[in-house]
Amino acid sequence: MARCDVLVSADWAESNLHAPKVVFVEVDEDTSAYDRDHIAGAIKLDWRTDLQDPVKRDFVDAQQFSKLLSERGIANEDTVILYGGNNNWFAAYAYWYFKLYGHEKVKLLDGGRKKWELDGRPLSSDPVSRPVTSYTASPPDNTIRAFRDEVLAAINVKNLIDVRSPDEFSGKILAPAHLPQEQSQRPGHIPGAINVPWSRAANEDGTFKSDEELAKLYADAGLDNSKETIAYCRIGERSSHTWFVLRELLGHQNVNIAFGYGPHACPASAYSRMCLTTFFTSLTQRFPQLQLARPFEDLERRGKGLHSVGIKELLVTWPT
């Protein structure tokens, strides 16, 4: 797919702020950012309250999505330009939503809010409202979504890409460093997964790297282009960014996202993989009464214990 089919530049965006049938939509991790200022004429989607089911941990359904877009003044035939902060990670999340429910004309503003601000382009604090429409969402296209059983069946069969940070992947931490409250239930990663942090696909200004750079990034990490791919993180915003890169920019057709099905969602019969140091640290944190016969650092330093037989990682299960 050509980049112009899924991306617009900041120059194009500024020239088309008032174009008919073009709607700019801001979706941010920081849901208050839009309220401070935004691209003139852009409307807001709140990823927490607008895109999440209020009762269960799932997406809004087609009826809810139709109601949402109708109330915000978006029509089926509109071209929707999505943007946000932090390299467009939640904008990519919303992009995936629009594709899930069959919206044909949707693109990302390359570089998002970061590039727009770096360029010194104008922002507005004026409230925005649009006339109500009668939007009709299509039934969900679940071919771009992977469910739990599909993830379990994919272990050592398909490409599994863990797009979180290396420290989350190894089990050292349970959440993004700047969001310590957003913890997974289990440390580590799904066995067989490769780690390609989502943010490596972006340049310093938030724009996407070239196709050549992106292809090399995933090839160097061990992505097998002949296999289907499932990307995962924790909530889905980071894996949506990777899904956009692989499918919309690089043209990989069999790419799915597993929302909420990282290592923390695997049943007791599945495993998370983590390094030994992290394992013992997590073990003693969970069970304070547990005492090791010898400090693990001492075992490691003396060359004894598990490291002495070449074991540097463990497959572990955690109680749910």
Curated annotation (Swiss-Prot):
**Catalytic activity annotated for this protein?**
thiosulfate + hydrogen cyanide = thiocyanate + sulfite + 2 H(+)
Q: Where is the active site?
A: C233
Matching entries from SUPFAM superfamilies are given as: Cytochrome P450, Rhodanese/Cell cycle control phosphatase
Enzyme class (EC, first level): transferase
**Which residues does UniProt assign to the signal peptide?**
none
- Give the Gene Ontology MF terms in alphabetical order: heme binding; iron ion binding; monooxygenase activity; oxidoreductase activity, acting on paired donors, with incorporation or reduction of molecular oxygen; thiosulfate-cyanide sulfurtransferase activity
What keywords is this UniProt entry annotated with? Repeat, Transferase
**Which Pfam family is one of those matched by this entry?**
Rhodanese
Tell me the superkingdom of the source: Bacteria
Tell me which residues bind substrate: R238
Record-annotated Rhodanese domain positions: 18-125, 154-267
Gene3D superfamilies, sorted: Rhodanese-like domain
**Transferase is among the record's keywords:** yes
Under Enzyme Commission nomenclature, its number is 2.8.1.1
What UniProt notes about the protein's domains is:
Contains two rhodanese domains with different primary structures but with near identical secondary structure conformations suggesting a common evolutionary origin. Only the C-terminal rhodanese domain contains the catalytic cysteine residue.
Function summary = May be a sulfotransferase involved in the formation of thiosulfate.
For this entry, the protein name equals: Putative thiosulfate sulfurtransferase 2
Organism from which the protein derives: Mycobacterium bovis (strain ATCC BAA-935 / AF2122/97)
